[in-house]
UniProtKB/Swiss-Prot annotation:
It comes from Janthinobacterium sp. (strain Marseille). This is Elongation factor 4. It catalyses: GTP + H2O = GDP + phosphate + H(+). GO terms for molecular function: GTP binding; GTPase activity; guanosine tetraphosphate binding; ribosome binding; translation elongation factor activity. Its EC number is 3.6.5.n1. SUPFAM superfamilies: EF-G C-terminal domain-like (SSF54980), P-loop containing nucleoside triphosphate hydrolases (SSF52540), Translation proteins (SSF50447).
Length: 597
């Protein structure tokens, strides 16, 4: 066991985490040169295209060190994005060490810091590595100073390397072996294995990726999953060297996979403890929690007959994404669809993109909302994740909205514009500190302001240099109202939005104006109104198309013309009573594009 090292790589997006992993795998001969491809651990197309890691992957590698011994290095690849922070914390608690990869030309970024603090909290040994040292703009001294100042670990011996050219990758592995402690654990104790990740395979069912803490596991053992309390018979165990290779046993300190013919992913939750049914462990490993969705949106098929197909696709996605929640929803405007819950905006985009790409769905998505706590007059509390479910204002005592703590990092020159943006979004500044050329801001902000477009705006005001991460703090009483959109005095439920009262006038007006551009002219007048309760706060009209009924009158009496005009007017009035307005697809997206000026 002294020759095992379990480690993961912490890095911000684009700091070279996947490339470094590729080099390490190549150096240890995990894959032959023929099988090697860029970003070998990112298995989904979307992961490759966006250059992000979504699911955790592992590789068990054999490395012959300079001291002549052969070490078994287990690389556990973690997601780097803040939406997936729970998965990151599970991956990290399966390791004894982590490589902190920092781009020598850019310095420390927000998500690196967030994940690095998680690692230090879990007692993981952090080994700093400076990547992209071959770039002409690389400034190692500055990067080292930033690591020491922002994160507070000694970086004087940080390894310099370039994952692209392969320079210094061996030094990275050597420092890993000397600095990271071997795993502790007792191979004879009752089995405890942490589920780091799980996914669904069409042939064998659920594959669980585990780190064995104590005990030994063999095929034909009966296992018990402690959180879901289900029992299964182990069919095979093994390791990934990215390729899966079956083994006879998995013992304490090792990282590998278990296949036990489990049919649904709900049984194998990330962070759960696997133990033997015949000799269970006294208690589960700490840190397990159910993942709660934070952001909600309605997904509706463009064609009504696609509803069943959408349900099937969501079921298949759910097999591989335990955090995705969905329930059927009916909207008067959009027909049948689903209300889906996501971990965050990136998660939502990925799910949408996978539905469109892998399952060929055409979707309409409503504006994302967060969960509000609504206290009614009779003292009961409702959790509302959908504007159309908001009760009547007369019954509401108060509405509480989720507040998050946001950590922002940016170069000094952008501080002003970022502070302005945060104030616009109802942020309250809690702290501000300078670290070299970097500034760290801490804000408390309503989550509702973040889910719409905060991230995009932050990137554009800071030219892409600012980075952020956020975590939920509490529910806080707030003056938010529901704005309904009425078309010809009928409410359209899919267009309702929940906004702060201060912004409600502006938002209502802006959405109405946008709708006016998007709804095509009909044969009759269309009135678009925004209302809070019974108060109309704005109105726009789409003028009717009309035929020139006077074309056939040359000269002649005015009463003749008036008669024709009156007749046309009466016809339009009748038409308006029975006519229904087709709302085009773009109108639903209009809500997302209304900027808070």
């Amino acid at each position: 066991m002294n020759n095992i090292r379990n480690f993961s790589i912490i890095a911000h997006i684009d700091h070279g985490k996947s490339t470094l992993a590729d080099r390490i795998i190549q150096l240890c001969g995990g894959l032959s040169d023929r099988e090697m491809e860029a970003q070998v651990l990112d298995s989904m197309d979307i992961e490759r295209e966006r250059g992000i890691t979504i699911k955790a992957q592992t590789a068990a590698l054999m490395y012959k060190a300079r001291d002549g011994q052969v070490y078994n290095l287990n690389l556990i690849d973690t997601p780097g994005h803040v939406d997936f922070s729970y998965e990151v914390s599970r991956s990290l608690s399966a390791c004894e060490g982590a490589l902190l990869v920092v781009d020598a030309s850019q310095g420390v970024e927000a998500q690196t810091v967030a994940n690095c603090y998680t690692a230090l909290d879990l007692g993981v040994e952090v080994v700093p590595v400076l990547n992209k040292i071959d770039l002409p703009s690389a400034d190692p001294a500055n990067a080292i100073a930033e690591i020491e100042e922002v994160i507070g670990i000694d970086a004087s011996e940080a390894v310099h390397c370039s994952a692209k050219t392969g320079l210094g990758v061996q030094d990275v592995l050597e420092s890993l072996i000397t600095k990271v402690p071997p795993p502790k654990g007792d191979a004879t104790a009752p089995l405890q294995a942490l589920i780091v990740d799980s996914w669904f395979d069409n042939y064998v069912g659920v594959v669980m990726l585990v780190r064995v803490m104590n005990g030994t596991l063999r095929p034909k053992d009966k296992i018990l999953l402690m959180a879901s309390e289900s029992q299964h018979l182990v069919e095979s165990v093994g390791v990934f060297t990215p390729k899966s290779i079956s083994r006879d046993t998995l013992t304490a300190g090792q990282v590998g996979f278990i296949i036990a013919g489990i049919k649904e992913l709900k049984a194998a939750k990330v962070g759960d403890t696997v133990t033997l049914a015949s000799r269970p462990a006294a208690e589960p490993l700490p840190g397990f929690k159910e993942v709660q969705p934070q952001v909600f949106a309605g997904l509706f098929p463009v064609e009504a007959n696609q509803y069943d197909a959408l349900r099937d696709s969501l079921e298949k996605l759910k097999l591989n994404d335990a955090a995705l929640m969905y329930e059927p929803e009916v909207s008067q405007a959009l027909g049948f669809g689903f209300r889906c819950g996501f971990l965050g905006l990136l998660h939502m985009e990925i799910v949408q993109e996978r539905l469109e790409r892998e399952f060929d769905m055409d979707l309409i998505t409503t504006a994302p909302t967060v969960i509000y706590e609504v206290v009614l007059r009779d003292g009961s509390i409702l959790m509302v994740d959908n504007p159309s479910k908001m009760p009547d204002p007369s019954k509401i005592e108060e509405i509480r909205e989720p507040i998050v703590t946001v950590n922002l990092y940016m170069p000094q020159e952008y501080v002003g514009s970022v502070i302005t943006l945060c104030t616009q979004k109802r942020g309250i500044q809690m702290d501000m500190s300078y670290h070299g050329k970097q500034v760290k801001l801490i804000y408390e902000m309503p989550m509702a302001e973040i889910v719409l477009d905060f991230f995009d705006k932050l990137k554009s005001t800071s030219r892409g240099y600012a980075s952020m991460d956020y975590e939920f703090k509490e529910y806080r009483s707030s003056d938010v109202v529901k704005v309904d959109m009425l078309i010809n005095s009928e409410k359209v439920d899919a267009l309702a939005i929940i906004v702060h009262r201060a912004n409600s006038q502006y938002r209502g007006r802006a959405v109405a104006a946008k709708m006016r551009e998007l709804i095509p002219r009909q044969m009759f007048d269309v009135a678009i109104q925004a209302a809070i309760g019974a108060n109309i706060i704005s109105r726009e009209n789409v003028k009717a198309l009309r035929k020139n009924v006077l074309a056939k009158c040359y000269g002649g009496d005015i009463s003749r013309k008036r008669k024709l005009l009156e007749k046309q007017k009466a016809g339009k009035k009748r038409m308006k009573q029975v006519g229904s307005v087709e709302i085009p697809q773009e109108a639903f997206l209009a809500i997302l594009q209304v900027d808070d000026k």
